[in-house]
Amino acid sequence: MRLHGAIVLLAALLALVTAQQRGGGRSRGGVKGSAWGGRPAPFRSWDTARYRPWQEGTARQNDCWRGGDVTFDISNDAPTLVGARATFSIALRFPGTQTVLPDGRVVWSQNCTVNGTRMLQGDPVYPEQLAEGSDGVFPDGQPFPRSAWGKRGRFVYVWWTWGRYWQVVDGATSQLTVGTDGVALGSYTMEVVVYHYRGRQRFIPIGHASTQFSITDQVPIAVDVTQLEVAAGDGGSFVRNRPVAFNVRLHDPSHYLRDADISYSWDFGDQSGTLISRSPTVTHTYLQAGSFAARLVLQAAIPLSSCGTSAPPVVDPTTGPVPSLGPTATQPVGPTGSGTATAPSNLTGSGTAAAPGTTAAPRASGAPAEPTGVSVAVLSDSAATEPLPDPVLSTAVADAAAGTDPTADPLPPTSVSSGGDAPGTVAPTAVEGSVAAGVGTAEDVAAATPGATAADVAVDTAGATDGDAVGPTAAATAESIADPTAGATDGDAVGATAESIADPTAGATDGDAVGPTAAATAESIADPTAGATAVSSGSATAGATAEPLLLVKRQAPEAEPTGCVLYRYGTFSTELNIVQGIESVAIVQVVPAAPEGSGNSVELTVTCEGSLPEEVCTVVADAECRTAQMQTCSAVAPAPGCQLVLRQDFNQSGLYCLNVSLANGNGLAVASTHVAVGGASPAASGTTLTVGLLWAPLIAAALGTAAYTYRRVKYSPLLPTAPTAPRPHSWLPPGATLRLLLRQAFGGAPSGESSPLLRANAV
């Protein structure tokens, strides 16, 4: 018995010591900002025999790699939209005398001597020992996947953040992709320690690195603002009367928004209105100079794959709550311990709140490759923040525009059966401490209610004291009055879109809130006390005995539940400096220069509109304007107007293409013309000297055609019948076709009608 008791006591002591050792290696600090202690602090277990913890700055760690130090290039694709996937990349940079082969081995790239040992080019830095079976395990004891057996140049990467860790076996480059579902918004640190396999169950730590990343609920965007055919000026200036291009670039490396419906709302700041487009590229022309603030609001409607397609259940408004047809936005809760906002609970993904789904996509030799192995562990005792509902989903922009409190309970939209053929849905408005005024007058309301007069309506509305709200909104029209909506409290107004107000509002007393809504399926006036929180018995009786109003039932179209769409927004704004540039250039005159020298010189008169130029350049090219032969530039003296007289000398006679460009700090304008030098008569005006020679044949042909046409269609009166005169002898018969053609061609026809039939002459 004593021996048995001693064994039990020793076993209990051993269990206690083991528990203390495990508990001493754990850290229960916050998820963010935890200091690196050589291994993930809340690690479930750590095999120190195989994986020695990394200790920064120790002499043992300084000589962990033969031939020099190994550095790391670590990066991530943040900022990451909450719900998307974040990717982390790391690449090992070995000493300059070493290189990585395509199969993953690290070898010497040249002959060298290290610590007195001669190294030959192509030899491995460390002898390769292929681990199989029990030799290949992760730090927490999980075995390598079979795909990692027999691999060369293996490294083990232990990633850690959010109180969780991921283990990946890979080559000299590796990637880790994790989900962000349920992660609170904010900035985080991803840390990684790298181990190299040396054989015999030995994994040597070679370094530690970290990178900062952020999780946001704003769509990350960048906008490129450019203007074509404008010289680049200082300060990002743009020229008026020329289109400015805006190109939006989404930062979505994980393609989280690939199925989203994205719209862009532009306000260019020049009082030109709002442009809504679904194209990421738009252009806008500023007509005035000055400073303008261009703003963009991007809306992404993301379909949720986990949402069902069934229609919302139909609830009797007199017996049950009114179902909310608005976006499924949950109410905000208190801030988390880290003081950041929380992610929405209705986001979908492969991960969960405790363990976001992860995938490993390692790379080798600079190209993507399949992962050799990955192990994901979740900490049961970590301080990771539990996912909380996002207080702002699709209602964020609406609350900001209306100035309402997003923490208040959202009012359900009102289903309206309008007089037209297409029923709609409108959202009610809430007004505190005031009386909502409808668009209809008292007479309109009375006319729409059988048995009610304008005076009755006035009495009904006058019965509501301070703090009451009676008045439908003017968002749409309806033919029916339904039950008051639930949740109307003292001082609130539940708006109804209706054309008539029935008698249930007559019984409202002090402290009551009456707000009828328009229901599509209601056929009669129901009990007005169903949706009010403080209604007296007298008002209930008055409302119940009111004469019912006959309504027409209409079938509302089945709409997709709005809770199946998640709305995310992105914003951008920038200041644009619009200046007046050189808007146009024209060569109005080209004349020969004064007769001096060789005579191969011309003078050009150039005018421009807009700002004054600071520099003028002329380029002389061949007749096809392809090969430049001469270029000259000169400064332009200040002048009150933009008119220049330029002199251009040519080496020899011929036809040339002359290009004139005017430039200043705000823009550039160009004009071209052809110039014929030597032998050609100069043109007094126009853009070329050869215009007369080129157009002369065409003008002559046009004049001849006009004269012939006039001769053919000219009217001639019929002449009186005259006796037939004797005709001279001719070798052609009078009615021959050739004779008639020659007569018409050479004008030999008489001035009268040429047809002998009309002249009553014998043929």
UniProtKB/Swiss-Prot annotation:
| Location in the cell | Melanosome lumen
For this chain, the family text in UniProt reads: Belongs to the PMEL/NMB family.
Q: What's noted about post-translational modification?
A: Glycosylated.
Task: Quote the annotated effect of residue 232 to V.
Answer: In strain: Broiler
Residues modified by carbohydrate are: 111, 115, 346, 651, 659
Give the residue range of the signal peptide: 1-19
Extract the ranges annotated as region (4 X 24 AA approximate tandem repeats of T-[AD]-[EG]-D-[AV]-[AV]-[AG]-[AP]-T-[AP]-[AG]-A-T-A-[AE]-[DS]-[IV]-A-[DV]-[DP]-T-A-G-A). Answer: 441-532
UniProt lists compositionally biased (Polar residues) regions at 327-347
Would the keyword Protein transport turn up in this protein's UniProt record?
Answer: no
Q: Which UniProt keywords apply?
A: Glycoprotein, Repeat, Signal
Domain PKD, by residue range, is: 223-323
Residue spans of the sequence repeats: 441-464, 465-488, 489-508, 509-532
Its main localization is other
> Does the entry feature the keyword Glycoprotein, yes or no?
yes
Q: In which tissues is it expressed?
A: Specific to pigmented epithelial cells and melanocytes. Not expressed in lens, neural retina, brain, heart, gizzard or liver.
One GO cellular component term of this record is: melanosome lumen
* InterPro entries (alphabetical): Ig-like_fold, PKAT, PKAT_KLD, PKD/Chitinase_dom, PKD_dom, PKD_dom_sf
This protein is called Melanocyte protein PMEL
Q: What results from changing residue 35 to V? A: In strain: Dun
Q: What does this protein do?
A: Might be required for polymerization of melanin onto the core structure of melanosomes with enzymatic function of tyrosinase.
